[in-house]
Amino acid sequence: MPGKPNRHRTKKFQWHKFHLFDQKLKNWDKIFYIDINMRIHFDIEPILKLNPENKLFARADSYPDYDRDLSSQFFKESKYYEKLNKNYNLSIKDYFQTGLMFYDTEIIKSDTKDNLIKLSEEFPLSCTNEQGIMNLHFGFVENNYQELDINVGEYKTY
C-alpha cells in the first residue's frame, strides 16, 4: 500500500462497515451508525426523526470548504486508478465520510454487502479503507447517498 505500508499493524479494524449492509440488519427499518471515536454533545433525536426513505444520509467528508474530491480516497499511483477514474467521477467534492451514517434499510439489497466486497476487490487502491468504496457504491452505483443537512433542529450535525 503506497504511503501506508504498515497500516494493517496499527489499525485493527478495517472494512468492518461493510457488515452494516448485511441482510440481517433489515430486521430494523433504519440504522444510525456512529464511529466509536465520535462524541455526542447534543440530543440526536432531531436526526432520528428524519426520514431517510431509500437514502443514506451522511456528512460530506470535505465540509465545510469542499476542497477535497473523491480522488483523495484512492492511491493515484495504483495501476487500477486509471480504470477507476474512467468509470467514476472522482472529481465530486461532496463525497461522504462514513463516521456517521443514518439510512433506510430498504437500501440493503440481497447483494449489497457482496457488491461492496467485489468493488473493493476490483479497485484495491483505497487509502481510507471502506469509505471510498462505499462512496462508489452508494454515490454512483445505487445513487442513494444524500448529504445530511448541517442544521437539524436547533443543532449542527458537524
What are these regions (language model features)?
Residues 1-158:
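Glycosyltransferase catalytic domains, chiefly GT-A lineage
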